[in-house]
Amino acid sequence: MTRIETRTEPMVINMGPHHPSMHGVLRLIVTLDGEDVVDCEPVIGYLHRGMEKIAENRTNVMYVPYVSRWDYAAGMFNEAITVNAPEKLADIEVPKRAQYIRVIMLELNRIANHLLWLGPFLADVGAQTPFFYIFREREMIYDLWEAATGMRLINNNYFRIGGVAVDLPYGWNDKCLDFCDYFDPKVDEYEKLITNNPIFRRRVEGVGTITRDEAINWSLSGPMLRASGVKWDLRKVDHYECYDDFDWDVQWETAGDCFARYLVRIREMRESVKIIRQALKGMPGGAYENLEAKRMLEGKKSEWNDFDYQYIAKKVAPTFKIPDGEHYVRLESGKGEVGIFIQGNNNVFPWRWKIRSADFNNLQILPHLLKGVKVADIMAILGSIDVIMGSVDR
């Protein structure tokens, strides 16, 4: 019996920019040979808003409300790096209490970021149930932010040069501890539901593998880097804010696949809860209501009015000038290394403001990862990278 062999032509399809699995306005031009991906070209820029140029025409205080729109799932990290850049350039010291408040806000944001990654990632691979669970926990974090800053997801406008805008409100520390007590068992629930699920494991194990050398050469950061066997976390490396005061571990894996990236993020949420608990317990002056009571009892010359018990070093004037010089500042966000290169020329506006976003760099490896995989694995691999297009395009 003669066998007829057919040769198919490669097919080019567009995924996005409006597809729900694209995690924003990302367009992928995918070349397929049957079910196999031959090539993939990401098309970005649909959400470009000129954030760097806006920064060069605004004072720092005017610019802080803009920055929560870079990565709108990690507004606190954007605000932190925005004030850290002129702080380092002008050598401004931040009170210890303000540093502790900053760390609490950043770690709450890390949890919220990982939760917002977890739900859609699992929905991409076919697990719909956790998508609804994660919003329940995120709402509690937003309630805490609303009590402290007046806003929820974005526009917190909380970080300031030299500290934070206002102290934590009455009873906030207790509410935050209640959230920690509530959230820890929920992470265990996620693990029971997801980690050993055979369908989930089949979809993500061995898929989108990145070796240690590839992760370094492609300049990956955050969970993408740590899941490939590189134990690198800027909170440990750069010793910024007051992370050295706390007992916590860098979470990392060696497999480098989608499953390893999932494990790193799940464990990081536990570490964040651990850091928040220690920060609440060790905060100089304690809860706001206790600190105010001590100040009232001991009068104006009380030691509780010292520098380290303040929420801000000194309120910066609208005419604050960024000194001459240049500096690169970075921090560890939920997605990886967020950096700012700032160049000042003794003006109220920075002369140059360069943003280094984590997911822009992490997204570059996508065409390399997708070559040779099946169409169904595109969503799992893209979802495991964790991109927000507001941050990629800026």
Curated annotation (Swiss-Prot):
Mode of membrane association: Peripheral membrane protein
PROSITE patterns documented for this protein: COMPLEX1_49K
Claim: Protein biosynthesis is one of the keywords in the record: no
Entry-linked SUPFAM superfamilies: HydB/Nqo4-like
GO cellular component: plasma membrane-derived thylakoid membrane
GO MF annotation: an example: quinone binding
Catalysed reaction equations from the record: a plastoquinone + NADH + (n+1) H(+)(in) = a plastoquinol + NAD(+) + n H(+)(out); a plastoquinone + NADPH + (n+1) H(+)(in) = a plastoquinol + NADP(+) + n H(+)(out)
Principal location listed in the UniProt entry: membrane
GO biological process, one term: photosynthesis, light reaction
Record-linked Pfam families: Complex1_49kDa (PF00346)
InterPro entries, per the entry: NADH_Q_OxRdtase_suD (IPR001135), NADH_UbQ_OxRdtase_49kDa_CS (IPR014029), NDH1_su_D/H (IPR022885), NiFe-Hase_large (IPR029014)
EC number(s) recorded for this UniProt protein: 7.1.1.-
UniProt KW Endoplasmic reticulum keyword: no
Enzyme class: translocase
Keywords attached to this entry: Membrane, NAD, NADP, Plastoquinone, Quinone, Thylakoid, Translocase, Transport
Subcellular location as annotated: Cellular thylakoid membrane
NCBIfam families (alphabetical): PRK06075.1, PRK07415.1
Family: Belongs to the complex I 49 kDa subunit family.
Cited function: NDH-1 shuttles electrons from an unknown electron donor, via FMN and iron-sulfur (Fe-S) centers, to quinones in the respiratory and/or the photosynthetic chain. The immediate electron acceptor for the enzyme in this species is believed to be plastoquinone. Couples the redox reaction to proton translocation, and thus conserves the redox energy in a proton gradient. Cyanobacterial NDH-1 also plays a role in inorganic carbon-concentration.
Subunit relationships: NDH-1 can be composed of about 15 different subunits; different subcomplexes with different compositions have been identified which probably have different functions.
The protein's name in its UniProt record: NAD(P)H-quinone oxidoreductase subunit H
Organism whose genome encodes this protein: Picosynechococcus sp. (strain ATCC 27264 / PCC 7002 / PR-6)
